[in-house]
């Protein structure tokens, strides 16, 4: 969650001049050592595949913006975003006409998205632990997930959409964003809402729901329910 806050701060402070894409779109492929954490900023559309193939990242963007874009792996973390300059960490305000990223790695443990972009994984993602952090108005979508532990954090107006099966899930929503995980079956679920956002979950054995504000928690299944609500929000069975 700390990383999410830092990314949001970076995204919104001390920007230099705006640079618009010239419409001449190019694609560049990068070869990296394996990574299991993804961090990206801005309006990019990121498509991810978990694969045993050699890790790679492909970026499609306006040619005049590519020199201002940083694509790197440090440790096990992939970072894609505007380059920062100087001690104050200034960055260009990039306005691409197209900004697409495709990436594959052998494992996935964390995804951080700040801005209006999107992250999607249409194929199976298997992992022991997965943390998803979304700040802004973007969207994260995983179509087939298998995990022991899952944490999903939404700050702002974004949407987190999940399908699959996990053992333990924890969801936190701050603002007007939504978590749509009623097709992600979980043995135990903890859901926390602060604001007007909503959670949709599937809990088998136990559900703990905490609400401050007007948001609601909707659930499928027949779990033992513990709830605390301050405001007009409620924990409701589908």
Predicted regions: what they are:
Residues 1-238:
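Intrinsically disordered, low-complexity terminal regions
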């Amino acid at each position: 969650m700390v990383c999410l806050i830092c990314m949001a701060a970076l995204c919104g402070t001390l920007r230099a001049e705006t640079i618009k894409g010239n419409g001449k779109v190019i694609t560049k492929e990068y070869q990296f050592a394996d990574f299991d954490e993804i961090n990206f900023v801005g309006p990019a559309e990121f498509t991810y595949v978990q694969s045993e193939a050699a890790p790679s990242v492909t970026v499609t963007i306006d040619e005049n913006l590519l020199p201002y874009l940083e694509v790197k792996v440090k440790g096990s973390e992939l970072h894609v975003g505007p380059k920062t300059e100087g001690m104050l960490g200034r960055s260009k305000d990039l306005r691409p006409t197209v900004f697409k990223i495709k990436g594959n790695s052998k494992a996935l443990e964390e995804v951080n998205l700040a801005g209006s972009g999107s992250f999607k994984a249409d194929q199976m993602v298997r992992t022991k632990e997965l943390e998803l952090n979304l700040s802004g108005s973007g969207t994260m979508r995983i179509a087939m997930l298998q995990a022991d532990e899952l944490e999903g954090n939404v700050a702002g107006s974004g949407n987190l959409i999940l399908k699959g099966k996990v053992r333990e899930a924890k969801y936190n929503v701050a603002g007007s964003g939504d978590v749509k995980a009623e097709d992600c079956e979980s043995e135990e679920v903890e859901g926390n809402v602060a604001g007007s956002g909503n959670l949709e979950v599937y809990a088998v054995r136990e559900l703990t729901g905490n609400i401050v504000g007007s948001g609601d928690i909707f659930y499928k299944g027949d779990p033992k329910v513990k709830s605390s609500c301050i405001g007009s929000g409620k924990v409701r069975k589908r």
